[in-house]
Curated annotation (Swiss-Prot):
SUPFAM superfamilies according to UniProt: Cupredoxins
Task performed by this protein: Participates in electron transfer between P700 and the cytochrome b6-f complex in photosystem I.
Coiled-coil intervals, chain numbering: none
Keyword rRNA processing attached: no
Cellular component aspect of the GO annotation: chloroplast thylakoid membrane
Protein name: Plastocyanin, chloroplastic
Gene behind the chain: PETE
């Protein structure tokens, strides 16, 4: 029968002590395989970055042109069915367009008051007297002459469906 003897062990305190670790040297056997990461030439990498940079520049320039071509969008009628233009006050630069979109499907149009447009502007050139009857029907007007343009919806003018475009 085997006997087990117990021994008293004292454990020192390790507060403030730092353990030192050393890695054992690696040993390779004759059958070890070493793989190396692929090497990328700096010029190939910078050429790729230049190409990506040019593509991003072209894409952002295109977006800016699209954004300036459609400077503002005005909903004809509110999301809740209210009669109005949203927003009712619009500011654009000369040469920019405003797109009017029928929001809910009530018949709407846009008529400019001939006494409330800049001198020399012919309202018949910018009025859209035909009704937009369906949701998402739209048209755009490009404003060339700086000034203030007051407009309204003919069937809903009495309900306060009016707006102003300010062209700088």
């Amino acid at each position: 029968m085997a006997s087990v003897a117990a021994a008293a062990v004292s454990v020192p305190s390790f507060s403030g002590l730092k353990a030192e670790t050393k890695a054992a040297p690696a040993r390779l056997s004759s059958t070890s395989v070493v793989r190396m990461a692929p090497v990328v030439r700096a010029s190939a990498s910078s050429d790729a970055l230049k190409t990506v940079g040019k593509a991003l520049l072209a894409a952002s320039s295109s977006l800016l042109l699209v954004a300036s071509a459609n400077a503002a969008t005005v909903k004809m009628g509110g999301d809740d069915g209210a009669l109005g233009f949203y927003p009712k006050d619009i500011s654009v630069a000369a040469g920019e367009s405003v797109t009017f979109v029928n929001n809910k499907g009530f018949p709407h149009n846009v008529v400019f008051d001939e006494d409330a447009v800049p001198a020399g502007v012919k309202t018949e050139d910018i009025n859209h007297e035909d009704y937009l009857n369906g949701p998402n029907e739209s048209f755009s007007i490009t404003f060339k002459t700086p000034g203030t343009y007051e407009f309204y919806c003919e069937p809903h003018q009495g309900a306060g469906m009016k707006g102003v475009v300010t062209v700088s």
